[in-house]
């Protein structure tokens, strides 16, 4: 807990109603307390950091002027919402963020009535807010709906689908879009749109031009003078800022204004509250504002572990096991040296996907397409048609956004694209929106796909090399964090497609492990004298080995860190069924529910796919394994 006596104003705020009881003149002091409180709290707990510091003033202004939760705020992405959570009844719990049974790291409707829309992925806010505004309009509600979007989210196509719809509606929706322009996603924001918005940042000319035009026009809208003034205004606006992009889509554009100047923010929002129809307010903010170290290293302070704010982040001393992301990072540089056709694509995840080194060593072969997963996948498809060897480095959860392109543009054409899928399976503290628990199911059903899941770091490297050499679409899906710590070498050795590895020869029951579950399965198998197989390939399965094991064993247990429905275990059952083989099966995996936020270890234990859970499930199904050495267990299996 934090001593709130050092925050005399903030300690009096439990809800936005309390905030609105303060005089407007005190808002700047409240913002300063909120920023200090956030720094102290995240220092104790860890969590998303720099993005929240950048929206302190905006958060205070919005909750002060709008009658939340009647008026509705929709936050894009959501990693900037810790200040919002502090002002909406969760101040004294914010130190539990990301912890089991603690505050969620992103807006979550089940957690608070002030969290109007669940989020974690980018670029959804305008669509959701427009839907709310339309529903309110149909119900006769006069509520206001505000979408706050930024952190690189304006690069995704979904944003422009929503803007296009909102700007062309009749009657016009009561919608305000706030563009929080901080030049960042997690890494630096990239692309032509970012450059265009950047040109607006220094322009104070636009508003002078617009206001001058209004004074000349007065109430005249359609006479020759008015038409001339509008043409003159548009000509000069186009020379200075991108407002015409939004205004041509039907939005009234205001800005850019300083997002850390509370009086200016309050004044602009008060004006916008009097206007009808779709509005767009462009604010310029600094990610990490108010904490010098975060302002200087916005990427490093995007998300942090617990740290001492007086010292900043301190690198941990001593050698550490490489993460799977580190393994990919080294492999992709080694493969690029050996394969000149290799190109790498990432949707705004250079740091998270381990591509910093590659981007520096091979800048002409590195393509950060910004938050644009659909484009990333089809870009790779286009490259592959010309003989390139593209690798799409992407998180499992974000690949969901490019699934149609994976099917329609890559798999149907059987193109040579490798998907390096990080954060597969149980991810942990970021919760349901960032979990990778569906990928084996949605990849396994795609024709022509080869799907691999490594049991350790060395195997991950071999599978990546296998995927590059394979003629067709391939995916290597690996978990967050470290593996068992096996030795690595610099070779680019490959694996035979569709061949499993026998880890331990036993009797009676065969444990078939996929990916990160193999080590736990092997420990159980050795203890109970059971056969253990590292399946390696989710598709194609090692048919020959499975049929041979079916002849000599009385039951199969499949283990995966993916939902059971449609997953790797389902593939084993389908194979046996096609061969008219009937035998007892036990499928262990993730349940038919979305993951909550907790540590990876807690979630694996809850799902029963850690060592203790696997052992308990096997003995519950075949209790004779504790005492009996008899191989015939079919009767006991029921």
From Swiss-Prot:
Reactions catalysed: D-glyceraldehyde 3-phosphate + pyruvate + H(+) = 1-deoxy-D-xylulose 5-phosphate + CO2
Similarity comment: Belongs to the transketolase family. DXPS subfamily.
Pathway noted in the entry: Metabolic intermediate biosynthesis; 1-deoxy-D-xylulose 5-phosphate biosynthesis; 1-deoxy-D-xylulose 5-phosphate from D-glyceraldehyde 3-phosphate and pyruvate: step 1/1
InterPro entries reported for this sequence: Dxylulose-5-P_synthase, THDP-binding, Transketo_C/PFOR_II, Transketolase-like_Pyr-bd, Transketolase_BS, Transketolase_C, Transketolase_CS
A single BP term in Gene Ontology: isopentenyl diphosphate biosynthetic process, methylerythritol 4-phosphate pathway
Provenance organism: Xanthomonas euvesicatoria pv. vesicatoria (strain 85-10)
Oligomer and partners: Homodimer.
SUPFAM superfamilies: Thiamin diphosphate-binding fold (THDP-binding) (SSF52518), TK C-terminal domain-like (SSF52922)
GO cellular component, one term: cytosol
Cofactor binding, per record: Binds 1 Mg(2+) ion per subunit. Binds 1 thiamine pyrophosphate per subunit.
UniProt name for this protein: 1-deoxy-D-xylulose-5-phosphate synthase
EC number: 2.2.1.7
Domain of life of the source: Bacteria
Enzyme class: transferase
